[in-house]
Amino acid sequence: MASSALWVIYFAFQQGIASLYGVTAEKALLAWNHSPATLSAVDDAHKAIQRAIEYSPEHPQYYFLQGRIFQWQAYLAQDQDTQQVLHAAKTAFLESAERRPTWPDTWAELLKIEAQLSAHDAAQLHSSKDSFDKFMRNADQYGPYTPAVNIAISQVGLAHWKQWDSEQKWLVIEHLARGLDGKNSRHLLADYLKSAHQFKLACTLASRREPKLEISICNSVLK
């Protein structure tokens, strides 16, 4: 009985310490949404999340946060290092997905990572076809109305439009419509599409969705 109680105390202590490190990493990621990260800040966040994983190696959220930190590192990295860091991010997200397969945001991030990897390596585009399909379908299955999923499928879907079959194209159209219509995604997605000079195309495709949605943000380009 005493040994069981000691184990419970030890486990709670481990989880508590892991949580402190995890919160430190998560706060850093939130701060970078407003003030871009620096390499030294990314390094500190890496150290924090690695400690969280050491104390709680089966916690899926810590691997998800690790993947996000690697994404920032890839953004800041020199060109020759980008591929290696993106692969590390993908590995972290896959670890998270293995432990929490129904979390849609993880599949959305994996979809974006796969697109980035193929953009840096044309030879990988063909080999990524199955991964694209798996990540997109899982994101859609587990989070069909999740803003992160709507945005990821819209962005990657348009960027790789020519490679999709008919069913996949209709899936992209569905998420374009949801993303441009959703109050928590419409402005972020529209800003991205405008910066990529794809806004009118996206609105035109979204208008094909049946039943139609009244996508007010597209009114200016669909008159």
Language-model regions: role of each:
Residues 50, 54-58, 101, 144, ...:
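Short coil turns that delineate tetratricopeptide repeat
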Residues 160-223:
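Terminal, low-structured helical/coil segments at or just beyond the last alpha-helical repeat
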Residues 1-15:
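Hydrophobic membrane-insertion alpha-helices, especially the h-region
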Residues 25-37, 67, 72-81, 111-129, ...:
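Short coil/turn linking the two alpha-helices of tandem helical-hairpin repeats
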Residues 29-32, 36-91:
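Extracytoplasmic/periplasmic/luminal assembly and interaction segments
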Residues 6-8, 42-50, 83-94, 126-140, ...:
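Alpha-helical repeat scaffolds
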